[in-house]
Amino acid sequence: MESWVFERGSLTRRLKAACGADFNVRVIRQGFAHPFPDEALLLKLRSGRRALVREVELRSRERRLVLARSVLPAQTLKGAGRRLAHLGNRPLGEILFASRRPRRHGFEAALAEDRHWRPAVRAGSGSAGPVWGRRSLYSIAGRPLLVAEFFLPAVLSVPESA
């Protein structure tokens, strides 16, 4: 699990290499919402500000491997970042790591209790307890975005050498 949590490159690229054509993204929800207080603090958003919040599953066929939550402030969605608001079932990492590497400003890893997740997210996670997660603060063209990824038990069946 450690190599997944501490992957320094594109998690999307690594999963695609390991899963091939079976890799896919399912959007759980996406829309403007109030970020969690700790997310707003990391993104330096003023109280009450909304951001684009996107929650997805990264999967191999129907098997859920990773749950991801991205928070993109409105300022990040301007100019070249406009395309980030219209990803559909495309993975954020595909855009984030395209051409120039994004700048990572912070990284955190921790065990996350699934009891804090919404029931719709928790259902079918395959988790019977805490899962490893990581959170990274990136910037694209000087504008921030926050990405959190939670590694579900099924990710252990994906070859780590990919």
Swiss-Prot record:
GO biological process: pyruvate biosynthetic process; ubiquinone biosynthetic process
This protein's pathway: Cofactor biosynthesis; ubiquinone biosynthesis
GO MF annotation list: chorismate lyase activity
Keywords, in A-Z order: Cytoplasm, Lyase, Pyruvate, Ubiquinone biosynthesis
UniProt-listed InterPro entries: Chorismate--pyruvate_lyase, Chorismate_lyase_/UTRA_dom_sf
SUPFAM superfamilies membership: Chorismate lyase-like
Record field: catalytic activity: chorismate = 4-hydroxybenzoate + pyruvate
Cellular localization per UniProt: Cytoplasm
Residues binding substrate, per UniProt: 54, 92, 149
GO cellular component, one term: cytosol
Enzyme Commission code: 4.1.3.40
Function noted in UniProt: Removes the pyruvyl group from chorismate, with concomitant aromatization of the ring, to provide 4-hydroxybenzoate (4HB) for the ubiquinone pathway.
Similarity-based family: Belongs to the UbiC family.
Protein name: Probable chorismate pyruvate-lyase
Organism: Methylococcus capsulatus (strain ATCC 33009 / NCIMB 11132 / Bath)
Lineage: Bacteria, Pseudomonadati, Pseudomonadota, Gammaproteobacteria, Methylococcales
